Amino acid sequence: MKIVADENLAFTDYFFSEFGDIQYKAGRTLTHTDVQDAEALLVRSVTAVNESLIQNTALKYVGSATIGTDHLDIQALEKQGITWANAAGCNAQAVAEYVITALLHLDASLLEQQEKFTLGIVGLGNVGKRLAYMAQLLGWKVIGFDPYVQLDSIENVSFQTLLQQANAVSIHVPLTKKGEHATYHLFDEKAFAALQPNTILINSARGPVVKEAALIEDIQRTQRKVVLDVFEHEPVISEELLNMLALATPHIAGYSLEGKARGTQMIYEAFCQKFGYDINKRFETQLPACEDYFSGHDLKAVLKQKLSQIYDIAQDDANIRACVKEGKVEQKAFDLLRKNYPLRREWAAHGGPQA
């Protein structure tokens, strides 16, 4: 069997080499010719899997080792009779830890604020519910908005109420452009007007959920602290926007070693189900041991002392800013940051909590 795989997927050889010949390709520039005689295609979110890519091919299976599906033309896949799978929730823990790291980097005193600090979570799916759990471990008050999901463990409120009450807002919705609850430009001029000026905003979901022009106007007006891991015009990012952000990272919020490995394992399991193979591999057997920071210690004390050793978000911020050339970060530089990213470990690898 011929398998075409994104060159940046983790542990592809471990999971798939026994099944056939793996050909590695750059995901963003994948062509119909690349996949024409392949039976399986393994991708990330940078590959648009659409009708022009998949029609008149030998493809029987497409697996995306990512949580989202907005890059997959599901209708076209099903029309062609191609089985597809994604990896919903694979990196949810990593994203939740990213958000908490960003908040504590901006204000370490949040560790002492308990319920004086209110975190508003927009989207209560795989990431949102884990973030709620982790935030409550720190004693924070958590409110959430999701038109489809309610969590018993938090106060569920309207979007407008969340914008007005939260000290920080973290976005965890898929990108959708149709329907009553479309998320495209969910954060527009109206939403920013409802936010308190000192409310922190974090987007680690999908770039176009936040309308960039409205965001720039808002920061100019309020001096708001904003953290972006995703961008509306990604992979190109303007220097003007970067200079306004409190923290910027190159779409790596979910880039933990565990998250990457878990994503590949999930599409491996779907692959095995499709082709009738036994599922007999686990990513945990491939991970190196880590130094234990948390066991037997107070969670807040460890985060106060070891946060930058667990994940140095300031270095990621510095790296993306160093890529600015002629007023912007170009696609090539952005993609290289992601390709060469030193995958961090989740807190649990250091003996810490996990949602």
Curated annotation (Swiss-Prot):
It comes from Acinetobacter baumannii (strain ACICU). Keywords: Cytoplasm, NAD, Oxidoreductase, Pyridoxine biosynthesis. InterPro entries: D-iso_2-hydroxyacid_DH_PdxB, D-isomer_2_OHA_DH_cat_dom, D-isomer_DH_CS1, D-isomer_DH_NAD-bd, Erythronate-4-P_DHase, Erythronate-4-P_DHase_dimer, NAD(P)-bd_dom_sf, PdxB_dimer_sf. HAMAP family: PdxB. The keyword rRNA-binding does not apply. Homodimer. NAD(+) binds at D146, D229, G254. Belongs to the D-isomer specific 2-hydroxyacid dehydrogenase family. PdxB subfamily. It is an enzyme of class 1 (oxidoreductase). It is found in: Cytoplasm. Pathway: Cofactor biosynthesis; pyridoxine 5'-phosphate biosynthesis; pyridoxine 5'-phosphate from D-erythrose 4-phosphate: step 2/5. PROSITE patterns: D_2_HYDROXYACID_DH_1 (PS00065). Its EC number is 1.1.1.290. Disulfide bonds: none annotated. Catalyzes the oxidation of erythronate-4-phosphate to 3-hydroxy-2-oxo-4-phosphonooxybutanoate. It catalyses: 4-phospho-D-erythronate + NAD(+) = (R)-3-hydroxy-2-oxo-4-phosphooxybutanoate + NADH + H(+). One of its GO terms (biological process) is pyridoxine biosynthetic process. This is Erythronate-4-phosphate dehydrogenase. The active site is at R206, E234, H251 (proton donor). GO terms for cellular component: cytoplasm. Substrate binds at S45, T66, Y255. One of its GO terms (molecular function) is 4-phosphoerythronate dehydrogenase activity.
